[in-house]
Amino acid sequence: MLIGYILGDGTLKIKVLKGFKDILPGEVELWQQVEKITRDIFTRHNFSEIRMPILEQTDLFARSIGEATDIVEKEMYTFVDKKVTMRPEATASLIRAYIENGLYVAKPVQRLFTIGPMFRHERPQKGRLRQFHQMDIEVLGSVNPLVDAELMAMGSMVFRTLGINVRLEMNSLGCPECRPVYRQALVEFIEDRFEHLCDDCKRRSKTNPLRVLDCKNAGCRAQVEEAPSILDYLCGDCADHFDTVCTTLESLEIPYSLNKFMVRGLDYYCRTTFEFITDDLGAQSAVGAGGRYDGLVEKLGGPVGMPGIGFAIGMERLILLLQQKETEFVAEKLDLFVIGLGDAATKLACILSQDLRGLGVGVAVDYEGRSLKAQMKLANKAGVAATLILGENEIETGKAVLKNMDSQEQCEVALVAGDIFAALAMSAQ
């Protein structure tokens, strides 16, 4: 069924789907600059980019995220007959690619990142859409707690570079050795308060009791305020691991706070979990989050005991924060606007511009037969560095005037791409 409405003249106006958004010129430049800045930070930290398909087997997410999670139970876009799903997050897809392509053979420790769209059938709200974009960063093959601290330091660098105020909150979820002991203590605590919990938490208390700590319902939050902390139940190895993470962050002078309620919404997390929180979007919001998942690679068919850790940054919330700050990134200007006056001159403009683009010059040409005045307005609006005007006289002489739009200085140049390129370089000095 088409999503839209009928206009007065009987034509159908098709609209974007609820929870989806067009990113238009004027805004997309901000996205491009953010991606450019973050890619630079990731590559400086020795991460390589990987790109995976959007569509994956449903079982991949059921096995990794957890069948009892809200994402798998309520939020995935699944083609039930084909048993395939539009990815709701990137970690599982990245690990599938890591295993399937044997990346662990070529390099024992893989440092990977990906940027792209994810899909969840949630209630659309500020900074949360049904198609949303994430930057996902993963380290596979290292259990060293210094890697945990390095990832959080890199995340802090991203937000600091973009001028976004965040605070870092952390917790540890222990391991298969110590978490069951804590789980039992939490279940006993919840049982005494069961009747005061929301329906979702009553269900979670049976299937995944740690998620009760993560409930946003004010009544539930009040009930679990005095819940035991998992940090008091960590085994020796997990306690040492978390202590190293904390002391390393202190050495790096990265502020953090402990949050015993942080359990994350995905079942695969263990040990270190963390979130970057901002208060600048109204309600408290996480703009980046992640943690360690030392059993996930093996669970999905990868090498036994292969550890991993990663985090994701939500692009939509990042962009909202930058727009609220009225942050402006200057888009790269075109180098040249070639103005053609008449059919023959416009054809020559087309040929010259293509030759110049081959030399790395950004060129704009108007093909609509506008006047000189109108094309000069277009050139000014485009913010080009220079203009080149072609008419009958220029075609006859094989020369034209190149004008610097900032200094208004002019020079005569032969209508040869190499000569124009050299003149542009001189004009820019």
Curated annotation (Swiss-Prot):
EC number(s) given by UniProt: 6.1.1.21
Cellular compartments annotated: Cytoplasm
Subcellular location, principal: cytoplasm
Disulfide bond keyword on record: no
UniProt-listed Pfam families: HGTP_anticodon (PF03129), tRNA-synt_His (PF13393)
Keywords per UniProt: Aminoacyl-tRNA synthetase, ATP-binding, Cytoplasm, Ligase, Nucleotide-binding, Protein biosynthesis
GO molecular function: ATP binding; histidine-tRNA ligase activity
Superkingdom of the source species: Bacteria
Entry GO terms, CC: cytoplasm
Catalytic activity: tRNA(His) + L-histidine + ATP = L-histidyl-tRNA(His) + AMP + diphosphate + H(+)
One GO BP annotation of this record: histidyl-tRNA aminoacylation
InterPro entries recorded: aa-tRNA-synth_II, aa-tRNA-synth_II/BPL/LPL, Anticodon-bd, Anticodon-bd_dom_sf, His-tRNA-ligase, HisRS-like_core, HisRS/HisZ, HisRS_anticodon
NCBIfam families reported for this sequence: hisS
Family: Belongs to the class-II aminoacyl-tRNA synthetase family.
Subunit comment: Homodimer.
Family matches, as PANTHER family: HISTIDINE--TRNA LIGASE, MITOCHONDRIAL-RELATED (PTHR43707:SF1), HISTIDYL-TRNA SYNTHETASE (PTHR43707)
Protein name as catalogued: Histidine--tRNA ligase
Species per Swiss-Prot/TrEMBL record: Desulfotalea psychrophila (strain LSv54 / DSM 12343)
